[in-house]
Each structure stands twice: as structure tokens, then as C-alpha cells.
Amino acid sequence: MVHNNDGDNNDQEMQEIGINEKRSQFPHISVEESRQEFDSFSNNIEGESKQFGMNRDAESNMAVESEEDFKLRKYFENSNRMHLENGGNEKKMGVSIRNLTVVGLGADASVIADMSTPFYGLVKLFTPSFWTKKTSTFDILHDVTTFCKDGEMVLVLGRPGAGCSTLLRVIANQTASYVSVKGDITYGGIPSKEFEKYRGEPIYTPEEDSHHPTLTVRETLDFALKCKTPGNRLPDETKRSFRDKVFNLLLSMFGIVHQADTIVGNEFIRGLSGGERKRLTITEAMVSSASITCWDCSTRGLDAASAFDYAKSIRIMSDTLHKTTIASFYQASDSIYNVFDKVCVLEKGRCIYFGPVGMAKQYFMSLGFDCEPRKSTPDFLTGVTNPQERIIKKGFEGRTPETSADFEEAWKNSDIYRDQLQEQKEYEELIERTQPKVAFVQEVRDANSKTNFKKSQYTTSFVTQVIALIKRNFALVLNDKFGMYSKYLSVLIQGFVYASLFYNMDTDITGLFTRGGAILSAVIFNAFLSIGEMAMTFYGRRVLQKHKSYALYRPSALHIAQVVTDIPFTAIQVFLFSIIAYFMFGLQYDAGKFFIFCFTLLGASLACTALFRCFGYLCPSMYIAQNISNVFIIFMLTYSGYTIPIPKMHPWFSWFRHINIFTYAFKALMANEFEGLDFNCKESAIPYGPAYQGSEFDAYRICPLGGIEQGSLYFKGDFYMDKTLSFATGEMSQNVIIVYCWWVFFVVCNMFAMEYIDHTSGGYTHKVYKKGKAPKMNDVEEEKQQNAIVAKATSNMKDTLHMDGGIFTWQNIRYTVKVPGGERLLLDNIEGWIKPGQMTALMGSSGAGKTTLLDVLAKRKTLGVVEGDSHLNGRELEIDFERITGYVEQMDVHNPGLTVREALRFSAKLRQEPEVSLEEKFKYVEHVLEMMEMKHLGDALIGTLETGVGISVEERKRLTIGVELVAKPQILFLDEPTSGLDAQSSYNIIKFIRKLADAGMPLVCTIHQPSSVLFEHFDRILLLAKGGKTVYFGDIGEKSKTLTSYFERHGVRPCTESENPAEYILEATGAGVHGKSDVNWPEAWKQSPELADISRELAALKEQGAQQYKPRSDGPAREFSQSTWYQTKEVYKRLNLIWWRDPYYTYGSFVQAALCGLIIGFTFWNLQGSSSDMNQRIFFIFEALMLGILLIFVVMPQLIIQREYFKRDFASKFYSWFPFAISIVVVELPFIVISGTIFFFCSFWTAGLHKTSDDEQTFYFWFIFIIFMFFCVSFGQAVAAVCINMFFAMTLIPLLIVFLFLFCGVMVPPSSIPTFWRGWVYHLNPCRYFMEGIITNILKTVRVECSEEDMAIFTFPKSYNTCQNYTSAFQSYKPSGYVESATLNGEPACGYCIYKNGEEYYETLGWSADNRWRNVGIIIGFFVFNILMVILFVYLTRKGSR
């Protein structure tokens, strides 16, 4: 945590080679000065604490009081001293690396997967030439030798692809993603292999932020602290006091004290700002108490002042706590750079410099490179590897290194290289003598809690981890109150629907069968609710992977906590359903039976939840998991014992009932209900009718139920269970226990799956390309060609670019949002303009409102109230404003199924003017690819970071910019275009934007951490303070003199020649974590003469714009560039390509259809013409209906995911809502036809339906099934279109599915459906028309011939002489079925078969074969209605909430 890493009583030898050497070698870094500087820093915080403390409520007083006493340096030193005095040890673990080579998969090792991939795999399998072909590889890092002593800080610099992130991951011992890792890595003398057991001691913090969005900052950090509270705390220090102390310390360090009770949020949930979320990520990493920390671009999203504050904090912690710190920053100012001790420069995987930061610049200048004035040292160090950026001194032409291999050779021939090797050797010898690993190992063991194993990788015991995770999981559920309440509301509604359908069932033959349906439906209901948990397993994977690497907890502990959390919430769900359903069903009014009912349903729900989670943990894709779960549901439902009695099951699948949760739950619930329950069949005993009412006939009537003796008109439920279902009521307890055993079994399986299966990439992204399009990796010749392409593109920029912009002005812009308790003003009377030929920078500290202002100016805001005026060329903004403006947003939202080139071409085709030819558009795309240094990525899949397949974070940012540039916008808004980019890429981007401005494009660009070189490209600046108030708007001036003179005029110290003006003004205005200023800058601006000049200039510019830029002559403004037909065609082509490239989704549905078809077909194998087989035909169709309904769950995520990309495209006016809505439906149809046809061929003939069907019936079966599948898919899409997210969809869909399958006429015959529901729901249910159409189709030509076991055989009074005489009245009363003469125990008898043909069966349901094609038309009508609903709700939700 803090104190257990520390120590200041260093060995004398360590002092000589360690700290003292650092002071002498690096005069620009002084530990004492750093400490003194932090004293001032602490005092500033104390002042802020007192200022804000007056406004804090009682709940947060503790945080403020701790903050007032906060002194970081003193805290660390005192904590360390007290820790050592109480018997603690030091964890001083430096890192030494020799000859490190990391090998990764080559770009051509894998290609973009699509529907042809399986066939290509088969060709490779049977082609001998592929058998010996090795997978291509390349060196991500090549022969790197470096080291970092404890207490030192090493900065790793390099361009994208240089290997910086890989070096950090390898140092953090995260090597699973690579083909091989060669070389020697030791940690304080411990080899890397042995050091693996100390997980969490070396940590890697990636640049992206992964947190649970619904937790607050306090809950996030308090949980991490609970998992990392050491056992060797100070005397009398409780766990609670320790956590409070560290919590307040870290929040104060990073300036998020006042955000402690704010939820973290994400791109969809409002919470912390991007910068605040980044500080939380840093804080959480510090809680891990690692001795070796690797920070990968941890300042991304922070302003320059906050980034510097962060670096200083890390510096002081490294000095006082002897932490080993290695960090990689894409953009680092000189201030940050000088905080570090050493710098390692990488290029194409090769180390081209490693040594003191103070000598790096001079080293490269000695090679013949020159540095521009005011250019920061980090920019210079990475810039020398870029042919377009580096400057060669006179006389060195042709003598400087060109390729990465040249640079590496020059480095290894240098004196500094030899000095560093010698220093590393001496450090390793020192480690060998002092053996710091002994103290380290002892300290790790002592830090483990007393209840934990001493050799455990984790600080706290397994039980402690589980308790902490349980509390966190409860917080996750309770913080999402809307989701929780909506789920329980759904349960209540569904409970009433189920209960009313099976309301007050009678104890007769009809009630006998409906009781089974009611009980099975209760099991199915809870199973459907459990399906949603499978999707949730995919959303927290990156957080789990991060916490696992930090050694916070075992993944299996997380699963146990989830299970414990499930129990109360699932119990509430089951109880709410049961209290309604049980008593309205009319089940036995017995308290014991009621609680057994609840207890069994609870076990079944928990077991199903564990089963579906197991699929989620085992499968890499949600679509694979969903398809597998659908097959299992069909299997479980079929072999539950209801649709097919056990005696009727075929041997090849009957084994499944022994491992079926549904079977045991159903058997237990049936035994619970039927034991001791009396049934009567007097009304339905055969024969019946007015002629048989006398008691003298009772002895000659028989219940239509197998096994009951003639004359017995009453029977026990136990008898029915035993004779008909082959269930034993005495096995109820055993079945309940088995249900819970399955739950425990799947819980254990999930624990093992979470421990040993990891589908995340660990932050590593692997690129995949189109087949045959992969470039060579880290190849010298390829490097030279790429440099030549970029050089040519740069030189031709002026000839290619030509923009026709205008003057854009804004005045008195105010933006207000509603917050609890009132309103909040986020922008306060902002004024300004942009015009051709000028670049305007928008700057301010984190939370100042920069992004908010851009959203308002770009007309992207959909929430809140915007006031003020915006004009383009003196006129009001027209409908085409969003299309003719480019907005590079901070979030990089791209469709992962496309390649980089395809994404750019799509933007160019739909946003450039229709008069521009396709050839010209594509030519411009290629030029932008070259300019953005993405030519080699053109055929690379964009992919996602979560899967680890696709382009990197930095490359996504470049793509975001490229997508806007290829549209040739007239105005360009850029929100953090260089965030996450290295210095050289940032330089190229800003240089490119400068060219756009010079070509006539007006633009404004927010920027957090501009170097002085980048800052010089801007002409004007709009500087904002917190609260959205203007600090300054005006010219920057030559060498920033105009800007700096404004601040100097208000009493700020002069800006030096070597200082970065951007950092200077942020410091002056009090930006940063703990920055403050004595000047009220917004008030100063209001009183300044510059503001008066601005007002006059605005009026003049509006008039100038109206005169200079005449109104368009080509007709009214168009919202979209292309016609609706063209948009639809292009959107459909794109979606079709995405579907083609998702074999998990497409082939998953095919395989699901095949498996379900085979399972159902062989389950109902070769059906005959008996009456029992008639029922089997009905359940065959019911299973097919369930397959269609389960498809709903599969298609919903696709629409919700694609809709997010649509919203981003719609905001930029790529295309309208109609093309997307119609395309997302149509793109599914061909795949549905294939899936339905596969199911048809796998099931129709195996079930023997062809024997009673002609060609027309066979075609009808296929056709109506395909149409029904169309309905199901479109229904799922319509529901998804209504819902705001997947969670809400998974809550709503079970409620709607209830109406589909319960009211279709199978679970309950139409005549038995309550009048209320039968009057409207039954007739509005598409499944009812599907069942009527397809059942009448397959039964209309079936002739029933009852088998002996299906025949009801009864004797008759001898006075009637013949069976015909005795049953004549019965046959006239009930015309269906037939009676024939039989014998019973050697006596003459009657045999009654309930049906003589299939037509008699469906006529009892009120169905007719004459309605078959009418039903097809009705289902098509429902399909069209669903499409209209998709279109409507895509339209209503086309604008995201922002």
C-alpha cells in the first residue's frame, strides 16, 4: 500500500551507486528540491481544503479533515520510519533486462475471419503444402538491454509500433500474449519465471480506463483497499483506519476529493469526466502497493498541468518509497521529462538510446541531428526517427542513421552504451551482495493477513476477498435501481399473466394436464430470466483481467461473491412470482407445499443462472454462448418429462434427462403437487353423454387415462405420476437435492473457468488484414518504402488540398443542464469566431467545458438548454450544417467489422458532394491514408480493444480524424485530436490541420498537452476556466508574445524564452490537480479592453461573411449529401459485409438450426399415426416455435450494437435513419432463410412428416416456418429498437415472450384460455397463426390408427349384446374418433380411439386448414408491423443523449 514498500536506512553501497550517483549525474533533478517543492504543493492543497471545507456536508467531513492535515512527503517518510521501527522490511526491487527479444505473430499469421474461413481451413487441412508451413512471426522487441534501480524512474519513448507498451508488459511479467520471450529479466535478483508467483508486485497500467461504471469513486477505491490491506499494519491501527487514511491521501494527491461520491460512469452513463476517470485509474493502481509500476500513457486525457502534478507525485513516491517506476508517455513536456532519471528510446522494437535524461539530447545531436528552438526534448528524441520531422545539421548529410537498425548500431557503438552496461553490471553485483530479495520475500509474507497463507499471491485471505466482493456486488446491483426495479416489475407482471392463464385449475382430467403445463411454465419462466446473466459475463471481463493482474482477488472469489449476491435477489424474484402464481394456479393450499414450491424454483433458477454463466465464461463470443444456450434450452425443454413422457423417449437421447435441471425440478414440483391430490374423471369418462348419466353405467365407464381400471372414476395424483409419467412421488426430496447439486456443480465449474480461462487480450492488440494484404513487420526495406510514401504525400499536400470555408461566429453562448436540486450553468456567455486561414486552440483545465462548447457549436447537444447565436457567413445555420462540418470527437467510435480503408471510403462516398466521382473520392482517401501514415493499415480490421484483435488506441485516433477529413468539411471541430498520439504523430496531425487552415478551412481544436512546437501552429486561442467562463480569446502572436503579455499585464511572472507558453498560461490560471491563482481571470476578462474589441469584431465579421460568401445557388440546403436510395444501398452493403465477417454470428445460427433440427427430429423419430403420436406432432411444432422465439435473444445485441455506430454516423449526417432501419432488418433475411432451411432438412424427414405430406404441404411447411423466423427476428429487433441498452432489453423481452408461447394454443387449449386473454391476446398473437397454419398443414392428411396402449377399452352390459349398441348414443354425441369391437380379459368389449384423423384433432381447437394461407398473410403482416416499429424507434432514438 504505502508503508510496506518503504525504507530509508539504505545499505552504504546502495547509497553510493544509487541515490548519490543519481544526484551527481542528473543535476537537473534534486531529491531535496523535489521534497521542498512538494511542501509548497501540500500547502496549496491545505489551502484548498480549507476553502472547500466550509461547503462540505457532514458525511464528507472525514475526507476534508484528513485533507487539511495532509503532507505527502512527511506522511511517506513517517509511515516508512514507523513501519521499519515495528519490524517491517523493505521492498526494493529493481529490474535488470539483458538481450530481451519479444516475438509476436506476423501480420499475415491470421487474416480477417469471414464465412469463407471454415472452408479455407478445410483446404489447409487436406493440402500437404500447408502442413509444414510455419506461422510467420516478427520481433516486437529486438535485443533490448536496460535496467531500472529501485527508487528510480525510467521514461520509455517511441513512436507507435516502437514496442513501448510491449516492454512495459514484459517488465510487468505479462507475457501470455506473445509467441516467445527470450532474454534474461530479473527483479531484485529473482528470475522472471520465479517472480511470477509474486503477482501484483509488478503491475502494468494500460492507457484505457476500465472500471465498473455504476460504482462511485469511494466504492471503487474502498473495495481495492479492502483487498490490499496488509497484515503488518502499525500497532493499534485498524483495517478501517488504515483504509480511511490511504483513501484520503490518494484522493487528495490527485484532486478528486470532491468526486468521492460521484459514480465513475462511461461513454453511456454520465459520471466522472475523462480526466477524472484517468486519475481514478492511477489512484487504483497505486492502491495495489506494487513495488514495480509500469505506466502506459497514463496522462492521456489530462491537461498539461495535471499531467505534471501526476509526474511529480510519482517522483516523490519513487524517492521516498523506493518504488521502481517505468512509464511510457506519448507526449511529455520538458517539465515531465526532467522528473525522470533515465530515458529509453525505442524505434521499431530496437533500443536506440538508454541512459540519463540529461545526456539524451546531446547524444542525438552528436549523431548529426538538430533541435528546433522551444521544441521539447521528448519531441526531439522521437522526432529524430521520423524522416519528415528530423533536422540534419549541415555537414552531416548522408552520415546520419536512417533506419531503426542504423540507430541501434550507432547506439551500441557509443560510449554511453558502454557506460550503461558497466553501470548495469555494477548494479547486478550490488544486488548479488546485498540480496534485497530476502527482505522482499519476508515483507510480502508479513503483509499477508493473518488468516491468509503466507505464500499466497494475494494480500488478503480468500474469505476476506469474497466478503469484499459481496459488498461490491451488492453496490453494483443497488446503484442500478432502475434496472433492479424494472426487473421486479417485470416479474410481477409476468406472474399475473402466468397465473391468470392457469387460473384456479380443476381437479379433473383437463386440470390434470394443465397442472403439468403450469408447473413447467413456472420453471421455464425463471430459466428465461437467467439467460440475461450470460450476457453480463462479457461486460466485466476487462475489469476482472486488470484486478487479476493487480492481485486484488482470485477470480473464483468473484464468482462465489456473485453466487452469494444472487441468492437474495433471486429469492425475491422467485417469491414475488410464486406468491402470485401458486395460489392463483389453484395448487394445494398447504404451507409446506408452497415453501417447497418456492425452494425448488429457487434452486432451479440458481442452477440455470450458473449454467448460462458457464457458457459465458467458456465462450469467446456472446453469440457462440447464446447459440449454445438456445440448443440447451430446446434440449432441456424437450426432455423435461412433460412434452414427451419418459416411456416414449427414444434411447439415443433419453440419457439427457439424467443431467437435465428441468427434469429434476419438474419431477420435484409435480410430486409436491400431485402427492395426495384426488382427481375425478366422471365428466370425461368414456362413454359419456345424456344416455350414460345413471349410476348403473358407472361400472361400465373408464377414465381416458392409461392404467386405470374400468369403473374407477376417481384416482390419486400419485397414480398418474407413476403410470403415465413414470415419476415417483417418493423421490421429491431426492430431486430437489439433485437440483441444488447441479447448482453447486456449475458453480464449481465456473470457478475453474474463471481461474484458468481468460478471453481478454491483456491490453495487447493483434492486427488482422485482408488475405494477402498484410505488410512486413519491422522490415528495413518496408520501413524505407513507408518513409518515402509519407514524404511524397507531405510534399504534395498543398497541391491536393483546397477548401472553401467561411466565417463562423458565436455570441453569448450559454448552456444549462438540469441537476438534482436545480440547474447548472456549464457555459457562461462564450463569444468567438473562426475564419479561413486561422487555427484556433480551445484550452482549459479538465472540466472547464471545452468538449461541452464544441458539442454546442457543432450542434451535437440533445439535452439541456442552449442559448445564444451562431452564424455561418452572417446567416443562420441551415439544415446541412452538421454535414458540412467535421467533428473529431474525443471518443473513437468505429464499426469494428470494417477495415480502415473501408471506413474512410464509406465516409467519402456518403459525405462528399454527389457531383464528385467515385474515383476522385477514393483517390482522396488514399491521399489521406498516406498523410495520416496509415497506408500500411488500409486493409487492417478496425476490431475492438476488448477482443485484442484490431488496431491500437493511437491508430483509432488517427482513423477518427481521417474519417472527418475525407468528407472535405467546410468547418472542422477537433476535440483532443492528439490525445493518445505520440509526439511525432501529433506533430503530423497538427501540421496537416495547419495545411487545411492555410487551404481555407476554418477550424477550432481543443488540446490538452500541446508542446511549444505544436502550439506555434495556432493563430488564436480561446481559454476557458472551470464553469465554462472565458479567460482569454484573441491572437497568440509571434512567439506567443500577444498571449503572454496579457497575463503579464495582470501580474503573472514573465514567460521565459525556453518555456512552453501553453503550460505557462495553464499554470498562470491555476489549472492542474492543486493549482490556484490569486487573479479572478473571468472577471479580469470582462473588464479588459480586449473583450470590447471582440464585440466590435464579431459584428464586423458577420457583415463581412454575408458580403463575401453569397447564398448558395444550387437550391436549398440538403441535410444529406446523397439520395435515400444511394444511402440505403451503401448502408446495406456495409452491414452485409459486417455480417459476412462475423462467422461466430452467422455460422452460429446455422449450427444452432442444424443441432436443434437434428435433436428435435431424432427425438420425434419416425412418427406414426397413433393418437399419442398425434400429440408428439404437436410438440414437434411447439419445439420448432421455441427455436424461433429463442432467435430473438440472438438478434437483439446486434441491433443495439450497430445502433450506437449509427448514432455517431447520423450525427455527422452520413445517412438518414430510414436506410439504417430498413438495412438492419433486410440484412438478416438471407441468413434466416439458410438457417430455416437447414432446420427444415434436419427435422422434417427424420420426424417422418414426409410420409403424410404431399409436395404442397412440404413447401407450405418450409415457407411458413421461414416467414415465422422472419417475424421472430424482426420482433427481436423491434424490442431492441425500443430499449436504450441490452440490460433493459433482457428485462423486457421475457415479459413479451410470455405472451408469444403461452397463448399460442398448445400450453393451454384456446377454449381453456380465460375470456379476458382469449378476447384479444390470443387473436393478436402471431404464434397462434403459425401454430394453426403449420399444425393443420401436417395433420390434415393424417389418418389415426390407435395402438393398443392408446385405445380406451371397456366392457358393456350384456343387455346391449354388442359394442355398437352400447356406444351408439356416445358416437352420436361425440362425432370425433371411432369405436371398434375389442376384448378385455376374454370378454367382449369396446375400444375407443379419440381421433380417426388429424382434422378431428385441430377442429377441437377451433382451427381450420382453410385458413393456412390466410395465416401466412397475417404473419407477414406482423413482420411488416415489426419493421415499421424498428423504423419508428430508430427514428425516435436517432440522436444520442449528450
Curated annotation (Swiss-Prot):
SMART domains named in the record: AAA (SM00382)
Transmembrane feature ranges: 482-502, 518-538, 567-587, 592-612, 627-647, 737-757, 1147-1167, 1181-1201, 1220-1240, 1259-1279, 1286-1306, 1416-1436
Highest taxon of the lineage: Eukaryota
The keyword Protein biosynthesis is assigned to this record: no
MF annotations from Gene Ontology: ABC-type transporter activity; ATP binding; ATP hydrolysis activity; ATPase-coupled transmembrane transporter activity
Cellular component aspect of the GO annotation: membrane
PROSITE patterns assigned: ABC_TRANSPORTER_2
Subcellular locations according to the entry: Membrane
Record-annotated ABC transmembrane type-2 domain positions: 478-718, 1144-1369
GO BP terms: aggregation involved in sorocarp development; sorocarp morphogenesis
Similarity comment: Belongs to the ABC transporter superfamily. ABCG family. PDR (TC 3.A.1.205) subfamily.
Protein name listed in UniProt: ABC transporter G family member 11
Taxonomic classification: Eukaryota, Amoebozoa, Evosea, Eumycetozoa, Dictyostelia
Encoding gene (name): abcG11
